[in-house]
Amino acid sequence: MCTAIRLTTRDHYFGRNLDLEYSYQETVAITPRRYPFHFRHEGTNSDHFAMIGMAFVVDGMPLYYEATNEKGLSMAGLNFPASAVYHDVKPDCANIASFELIPYILGQCESVQEAKTLLQRLNITRDGFSEQLPPSPLHWMIDDREGCIVVESMADGLHVYDNWSNVMTNEPPLPLQLENLAHYQALSPEEPVNRFAPCLLYTSDAADEARSVD
């Protein structure tokens, strides 16, 4: 299972693992500022931010798994096989194929807030890159130093969620992932309080007491 995560302390970190048992010969790919991106329905963008990430490069097109642009905005696509639904081209929308979404967002946006604005009129289309490379069912996490969002294209349309957990994995949709965290709210690095039989010692307590006697 793949997982994306952001960490912000004094510095800011974003990363993901690619938990697959096979390889598409992915490699580190750097796209300079004026390298042309030819979008299926939105023309060509030759004036964009530079970006670096892991990609499967086909016919000069980096099919990014994840990337970070020169402004510090990062984005990763993770598997979303049971829930992802892409749509036909829609009028009055920016129609972007799933394999185009990372360069489309990172090429234009400096921040999560700008990405939110751009996503308001976005439609993710059913287009595959080629007959041999059909569209992958994905959802995306977008991150900067100030915040984090998740983008999911489903049967009822495009959803953009603030992601306060700063983590995203594959299925289910993000609201259910956040709900599932409630099952683990009792976990702690501290020893639990013994409310069942206070006269009994936990194993670790007994070991500590034995060491103090020695």
Give the positions of each predicted feature.
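A contiguous strand-loop segment
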Residues: M1-C93, R126
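Compact, glycine/acidic-enriched structural inserts
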Residues: P36, V89-N123
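Function-determining sites in protein domains
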Residues: S111-Q113, S188-R195, C199-L201
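Secretory/export targeting leaders with adjacent low-complexity proregions
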Residues: L118-E131, H139-W140
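Extended amphipathic alpha-helical segments with heptad-repeat/coiled-coil character used for oligomerization
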Residues: P134-P175
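Long, His/Glu/Asp-enriched segments that create or flank divalent metal/ion-associated functional microenvironments
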Residues: E171-N194
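Conserved small/polar residues in nucleotide/adenosyl-binding loops
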Residues: Y202-A210
